[in-house]
C-alpha cells in the first residue's frame, strides 16, 4: 500500500523539522537523562523531592490550621459571621434552618476546633437557604470532580503505574521517581498503546461525569426575570411613554406592565453609600452620648487617630456635630445629583410584560433570523414610533437578575467600553508575558553561578519545595491581578464579570503553571537560541528532553503545595485579613471602625475560584497518564478544597446571585483537561516514536476528532441564538417540571417595581421579595439587598456593595 502524496509531503516536512530540532528516528534516550547534569532543579533528590515536600507542606498546613483556629476565636469579625453577631447580639450566630432541627445555635463554633465538625454537619439544604443556588451548583461540581478522580486514581495506580514500573529504560533504583513515569518504557514496547487507550477512557469518563452534573443544574427561573427584556440602543431622548406605545402598537397581543429607563447613577450610588455610612456613624455617637451622657471628640483629619496632641490644623471636634455637618453636605449633593441624573439617560430600558410567553415572542422577533428568498432580514415588527426610536439599532435580551446588575457600570458603553477593555487587557498581557516560571529563574541562577557552590542547591528543600512554593505564590498572585483587571473592565452584570474572570484566570494559570514548565527549565533560552543563533554548537535542540523522567515530580510537588498550603491559606483568607487590619488601622473613629466591620464581608468570587480549581484539575489530568502518582495527591487537593469552600461559603462570604452560564462554562473548561492529556501523549509519541509510528497516528486521529467535536459544539453554541426554536422555553417540559417541583406562584403575576421614597430610612433593607430594576428613587433611597440572604444583616451588607 502506497502512501498518499499529502502524507508523503507531510512526512518529508516532518523529517526536516525533526532534523532541525536534532531529533532522529531513533533518539538517543541517554542524552536526555544525562544532559541536565549541570541543572540543580531535577537532580540529586530522593524520589523527586516528593517526600520532603510532602512533609514540609503538611507541617505548614497544620500550622495554618492552628493559626486560623486562634484567629477565628479571637478576631473572627472579618467576614460574614461578624455581620450576624453585630445585628443580633442577644442570640449570636443563631440562624433559621430549613432542616428538621429547626433553629441551630452556631455559637459553639467559635471554639478552637469545633468549626471542623460544623463543616461536616452542614447539609445542602442549609447551604441552599443561606448561600443560594450558585453555591450548591459549585459544590456539586466539586463532588463530581471528586468521584471522577477516585475512578482515575484507581485506574492510574492499579494499571498505569505497574505498566510504567515494568519498563527497564531507567535504572532499577527504587528511589528513582522516573521509574514511575512513561519515560521508563522503551519505544518499541506495545504497552504504550495502553496509555492512549486509558487517555481516551479518561476523556469519556470526564464527559459522563460532567454530563451528569449539568443535568443536575436546575434553576428556578423567576417570573420577573423571564418576563422582563433589557433593551439597548434607544435614542438618548426617548421617552418612557413612547417606548411603551411602540410595544403596544407593534405587538397588540403583548401587554406591557412597566417600562423603566436607565440613567447614569454611578455618582449617585457613591453619594448614597457615603450618606449611609455617615448616618450610621451619627447614630453610633448619638446612642453613645445618650448612654454615657458625655460628648465624644474626634480628629477627622487624615491619620488624625495617630495625633497624640492638638496642634494647629489638627484640632479635635465634636463627633455629632461633625457627622451632622457631613450628612447635610451629602444630602445637598445627592439632591443636586438627582436633578442632574434626569438629564443623563443611557439609551437603555427594562420592559416588563404580563407573561413570559410575551417576552419570549418579542425576543424571538428581534433576534431570530428570518430568511425571505435570497435575503435574510431581521427587521422586527414596526409601529408608528419605529423611526423615532430607531428599532433597527436595538439589541434585546432577557434581563438579568436585579441582584446581578452592576448599576454604576451601565454608563460605560460603546467605544469607550471597548477602548477601556482593550487597554486594560493589553497592559495585563504585556505584564504577565514576562512573568515566567520560577523553574527558569533557578536554572538561570545555575547558568550565571549566582549561588556558589552550585551543588549546594541540590538540597530537596531548595530544589523542589522552593520552586513549587514560588510557583504557587505566583499563581496565587495572578488571580488577584486578573480579578482587579476584570473589575476595571466595567461589566454590566456580575455573572458576565465572573465568567470573563474565570476564563482569563484559567488561561493565564494554565500557561504559567502547566505549559511553560512543561516546555523545559530553560525553554525560552532554547527557543531564542534556536531562532537566532545559527552557528552555536547547541543550536540543535533535543525537544524529547521536554519529557524528562523527573519532570512530573515538579507538578506533583505543585499539586501537594496547592492541596496543603493553598487550601490552608484560602481558609485563613490572609489577603482579606491583611486588608481588614489595614482598614481598621486607618479608620479615623470608632464609628468608622464599626463600619469597616460591617463592610468587610464580600460576595464569593465564583469565577476566580472555578479557575483556580480547574487549573489544578487540568494539571492532574494532563499528567495522570505520563505521571500517574500525581492523581491521589490531586484527589487530596479536591477533598480539602471542598471542605474549605463549604466553610467559607457558609461562614465567610455573602451569597451571590449569578446566571447558570458560569457553571456551564466551568464544565466546558473541565473538559479541556483530558484533551490536554491526549496532547501530552501525542507529543510524547511524536518525539519518541516518530510520525510514522502507528501509535502516533492513532493518537493524532483521536485528538483531531476530539478537537473537531469541540469546535462544532462551540460553533453551535455561538449561533444558537439564530434559531427561533431557542426561544420557546415556556414549552419545555423541563421548565414546567421545575416550576411544578418548586411550588412557585403562577408566572403571570404582574411586575410592579417597589420604588422607595427618598425619605426612607437607610437602615431598613428590602425584603427578599422586593426586587426592582433600579429606578432613580430606589437608588437614592435604600439600595436593594440580596434576595438570597436570609438575615437582615446580610441584606444590609449586600446593599452596601450594590453597584
UniProtKB/Swiss-Prot annotation:
It catalyses: Ca(2+)(in) = Ca(2+)(out). This is Mechanosensitive cation channel TMEM63A. Residues 75-133, 217-415, 490-494, 586-605, 651-660, 709-803 are cytoplasmic. It comes from Capra hircus. GO terms for cellular component: early endosome membrane; lysosomal membrane; plasma membrane. Keywords: Calcium, Cell membrane, Endosome, Ion channel, Ion transport, Lysosome, Membrane, Phosphoprotein, Transmembrane, Transmembrane helix, Transport. Mechanosensitive cation channel with low conductance and high activation threshold. In contrast to TMEM63B, does not show phospholipid scramblase activity. Acts as a regulator of lysosomal morphology by mediating lysosomal mechanosensitivity. Important for the baby's first breath and respiration throughout life. Upon lung inflation conducts cation currents in alveolar type 1 and 2 cells triggering lamellar body exocytosis and surfactant secretion into airspace. Also acts as an osmosensitive cation channel preferentially activated by hypotonic stress. Belongs to the CSC1 (TC 1.A.17) family. InterPro entries: Csc1-like, CSC1/OSCA1-like_7TM, CSC1/OSCA1-like_cyt, Csc1/OSCA1-like_N, Nucleotide-bd_a/b_plait_sf, RBD_domain_sf. Residues 1-51, 167-190, 444-461, 532-553, 624-627, 689-693 are extracellular. The chain crosses the membrane at residues 52-74, 134-166, 191-216, 416-443, 462-489, 495-531, 554-585, 606-623, 628-650, 661-688, 694-708. One of its GO terms (biological process) is regulation of nitric oxide biosynthetic process. Residues 218-413 are annotated as: Intracellular linker IL2. Residues 554-585 are annotated as: Gating helix. Its main location: membrane.
Amino acid at each position: 500500500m502506497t502512501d498518499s502524496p499529502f502524507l508523503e509531503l507531510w512526512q518529508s516536512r516532518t523529517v526536516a523539522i525533526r532534523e532541525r530540532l536534532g531529533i532522529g528516528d531513533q533518539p538517543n534516550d541517554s542524552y536526555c537523562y544525562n544532559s541536565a547534569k549541570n541543572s540543580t532543579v531535577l537532580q540529586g533528590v530522593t524520589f523527586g523531592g516528593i517526600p520532603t515536600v510532602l512533609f514540609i507542606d503538611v507541617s505548614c498546613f497544620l500550622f495554618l490550621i492552628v493559626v486560623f483556629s486562634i484567629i477565628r476565636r479571637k478576631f473572627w469579625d472579618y467576614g460574614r459571621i461578624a455581620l450576624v453577631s453585630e445585628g443580633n447580639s442577644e442570640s449570636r450566630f443563631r440562624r433559621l434552618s430549613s432542616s428538621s432541627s429547626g433553629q441551630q445555635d452556631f455559637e459553639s463554633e467559635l471554639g478552637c476546633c469545633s468549626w471542623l465538625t460544623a463543616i461536616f454537619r452542614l447539609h445542602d439544604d442549609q447551604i441552599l437557604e443561606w448561600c443560594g443556588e450558585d453555591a450548591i451548583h459549585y459544590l456539586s461540581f466539586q463532588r463530581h470532580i471528586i468521584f471522577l478522580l477516585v475512578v482515575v486514581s484507581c485506574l492510574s495506580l492499579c494499571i498505569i503505574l505497574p505498566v510504567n514500573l515494568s519498563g527497564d529504560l531507567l535504572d532499577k533504583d527504587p528511589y528513582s521517581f522516573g521509574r514511575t513515569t512513561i519515560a521508563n518504557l522503551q519505544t518499541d514496547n506495545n504497552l504504550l498503546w495502553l496509555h492512549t487507550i486509558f487517555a481516551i477512557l479518561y476523556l469519556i469518563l470526564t464527559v459522563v461525569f460532567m454530563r451528569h452534573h449539568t443535568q443536575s443544574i436546575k434553576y428556578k427561573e423567576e417570573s420577573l426575570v423571564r418576563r422582563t427584556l433589557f433593551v439597548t440602543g434607544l435614542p438618548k431622548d426617548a421617552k418612557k411613554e413612547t417606548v411603551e406605545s411602540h410595544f403596544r402598537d407593534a405587538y397588540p397581543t403583548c401587554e406591557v406592565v412597566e417600562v423603566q429607563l436607565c440613567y447614569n447613577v454611578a455618582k449617585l450610588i457613591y453619594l448614597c453609600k457615603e450618606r449611609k455610612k455617615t448616618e450610621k456613624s451619627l447614630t453610633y455617637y448619638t446612642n453613645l452620648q445618650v448612654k454615657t451622657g458625655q460628648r465624644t471628640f474626634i480628629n477627622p483629619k487624615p491619620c488624625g487617630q495617630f495625633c497624640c496632641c492638638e496642634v494647629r490644623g489638627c484640632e479635635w471636634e465634636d463627633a455629632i456635630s461633625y457627622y451632622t455637618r457631613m450628612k447635610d453636605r451629602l444630602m445637598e449633593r445627592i439632591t443636586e445629583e438627582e436633578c442632574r441624573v434626569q438629564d443623563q439617560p443611557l439609551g437603555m430600558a427594562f420592559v416588563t410584560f404580563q407573561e413570559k410567553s410575551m417576552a419570549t415572542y418579542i425576543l424571538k422577533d428581534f433576534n431570530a433570523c428570518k430568511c425571505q428568498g435570497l435575503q435574510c432580514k431581521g427587521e422586527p415588527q414596526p409601529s408608528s414610533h419605529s423611526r423615532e426610536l430607531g428599532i433597527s439599532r436595538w439589541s434585546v435580551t432577557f434581563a438579568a437578575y436585579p441582584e446581578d446588575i452592576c448599576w454604576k457600570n451601565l454608563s460605560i458603553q460603546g467605544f469607550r467600553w471597548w477602548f477601556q477593555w482593550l487597554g486594560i487587557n493589553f497592559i495585563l498581557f504585556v505584564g504577565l508575558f514576562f512573568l515566567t516560571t520560577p523553574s527558569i529563574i533557578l536554572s538561570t541562577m545555575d547558568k550565571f553561578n549566582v549561588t556558589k557552590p552550585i551543588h549546594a542547591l541540590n538540597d530537596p528543600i531548595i530544589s523542589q519545595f522552593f520552586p513549587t512554593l514560588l510557583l504557587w505564590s505566583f499563581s496565587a498572585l495572578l488571580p488577584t491581578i486578573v480579578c482587579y483587571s476584570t473589575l476595571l473592565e466595567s461589566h454590566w452584570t456580575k455573572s458576565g464579570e465572573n465568567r470573563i474572570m474565570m476564563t482569563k484566570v484559567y488561561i493565564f494559570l494554565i500557561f504559567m503553571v502547566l505549559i511553560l514548565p512543561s516546555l523545559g527549565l530553560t525553554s525560552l533560552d532554547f527557543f531564542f537560541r534556536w531562532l537566532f543563533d545559527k552557528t552555536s554548537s547547541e543550536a540543535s535542540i533535543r525537544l524529547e528532553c521536554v519529557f524528562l523522567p523527573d519532570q512530573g515530580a515538579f507538578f506533583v510537588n505543585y499539586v501537594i503545595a496547592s492541596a496543603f498550603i493553598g487550601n490552608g491559606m484560602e481558609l485563613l483568607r490572609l489577603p482579606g485579613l491583611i486588608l481588614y487590619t489595614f482598614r481598621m488601622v486607618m479608620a479615623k473613629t470608632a464609628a468608622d471602625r464599626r463600619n469597616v466591620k460591617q463592610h468587610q464581608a464580600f460576595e464569593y468570587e465564583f469565577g476566580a475560584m472555578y479557575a483556580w480549581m480547574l487549573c489544578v484539575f487540568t494539571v492532574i489530568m494532563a499528567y495522570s497518564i505520563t505521571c500517574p502518582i500525581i492523581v491521589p495527591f490531586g484527589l487530596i487537593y479536591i477533598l480539602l478544597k471542598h471542605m474549605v469552600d463549604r466553610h467559607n461559603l457558609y461562614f465567610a462570604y455573602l451569597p451571590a446571585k449569578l446566571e447558570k452560564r458560569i457553571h456551564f462554562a466551568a464544565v466546558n473548561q473541565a473538559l479541556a483537561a483530558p484533551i490536554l492529556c491526549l496532547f501530552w501523549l501525542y507529543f510524547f509519541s511524536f518525539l519518541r516514536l516518530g510520525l510514522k509510528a502507528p501509535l502516533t497516528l492513532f493518537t493524532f486521529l483521536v485528538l483531531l476528532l476530539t478537537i473537531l467535536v469541540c469546535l462544532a459544539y462551540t460553533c453551535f453554541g455561538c449561533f444558537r441564538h439564530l434559531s427561533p426554536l431557542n426561544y420557546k422555553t415556556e414549552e419545555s417540559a423541563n421548565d414546567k417540571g421545575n416550576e411544578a417541583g418548586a411550588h412557585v406562584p403562577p408566572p403571570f403575576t404582574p411586575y410592579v417595581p417597589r420604588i422607595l421614597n427618598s425619605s426612607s430610612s437607610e437602615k431598613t433593607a428590602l425584603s427578599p421579595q422586593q426586587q426592582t430594576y433600579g429606578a432613580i428613587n430606589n437608588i437614592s433611597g435604600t439600595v436593594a439587598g440580596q434576595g438570597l440572604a436570609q438575615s437582615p444583616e446580610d441584606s444590609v451588607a449586600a446593599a452596601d456593595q450594590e453597584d
